[in-house]
Regions:
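Rossmann-like AdoMet
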Residues: 1-50, 54-60, 89
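Conserved class I S-adenosyl-L-methionine
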Residues: 60-71
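Glycine-rich SAM-binding Motif I of class I
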Residues: 72-76
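Helix-to-beta-strand junctions that scaffold the AdoMet/dcAdoMet cofactor pocket
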Residues: 82-87, 181-183
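Conserved SAM-binding motif I beta-strand of class I
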Residues: 87-96
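Hydrophobic/aromatic anchor residues within beta-strands of the central parallel beta-sheet
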Residues: 91, 118-119, 187
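S-adenosyl-L-methionine
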Residues: 97-156, 168
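C-terminal substrate-binding/active-site "lid" region of AdoMet-derived donor-dependent transferases
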Residues: 149-154, 167-239
Length: 239
């Protein structure tokens, strides 16, 4: 009889490369990457984006929250992958302010995803506050087999939350995300850069906040680090 894999082995498999999905950048994502260069904006490299997509598809979430949509580079990778599935997830893209909202809305239309994807212009910290209140007030309905909770401010409880914000808000957004996860919910983010010699005190303090976060949650959450070509992908899931 085949041996049942350990939780550690299953977690490692979840975070591994999915060769079935291919390596080529989706056409719409490639066009957005060119647009980023023209706008002098940055995004994650292709290796990082591909692995986030691989893990997201393998995890098979029913409800997704993407925090920090920008102009949709990562979003395009994910929509390209999920749009081919028969059962679409409920997907919320959070991009504080209305600067890129119109771009993200047009992107969802290009994938014919307007009926299963919504764009929120709220700051994530504010949306998370509303989400926690909604989860608390609808706890009985969420545990019911015969009744359904409605009116959620985001895709809740979330099976997958992707934190793709600057290092200034990263730790706070992760902390706000933890209560929004479903039982087997997963957080994906990219590890902040280790401060180099001569870095400012602010940069050093910011990385210390990251280290403190990892230390504080490691007893109750399984944390995986996936070294990639240019970044390290970090996954957080309840034990």
């Amino acid at each position: 009889m085949d041996e049942v894999p350990s939780e550690r082995d299953a977690f490692a498999w979840l975070l591994s490369e999915n060769i079935e999905l291919g390596e080529e950048e989706p056409k719409i994502a490639a066009a957005i990457n060119e647009q980023l260069a023209h706008m002098e904006l940055t995004s994650h490299d292709e290796f990082t984006l591909r692995r986030i997509r691989d893990v997201a598809i393998r995890h098979d979430p029913k409800k997704i929250i993407e925090v920090g949509g920008g102009i949709g580079h990562l979003t395009a990778w994910l929509l390209d992958a999920f749009s081919s599935k028969v059962d679409k997830p409920e997907y919320t893209i959070v991009e504080g302010g209305n600067k890129f909202a119109a771009i993200l809305l047009r992107l969802t239309q290009r994938f014919n995803a307007s009926d299963w994807v919504r764009v929120s212009g709220m700051r994530f910290q504010e949306l998370a506050g509303e989400s926690k209140a909604w989860l608390l007030s609808n706890q009985a309905l969420l545990n019911s087999n015969s009744m359904e909770a409605t009116g959620a401010p985001a895709s809740l409880p979330a099976d997958l939350i992707i934190i793709d914000v600057g290092e200034l808000e990263q730790v706070e957004c992760i902390q706000e995300s933890l209560p929004l996860l479903s039982k087997n919910g997963l957080i994906l983010t990219v590890e902040p850069n280790v401060p180099f010699e001569g870095a400012s005190e602010e940069e050093s303090n910011r990385f210390q906040l990251w280290m403190d976060l990892i230390r504080d949650i490691q007893e109750t959450y399984r944390i995986g680090f996936v070294p990639l070509k240019k970044t390290t992908l970090v996954a957080i899931m309840s034990k």
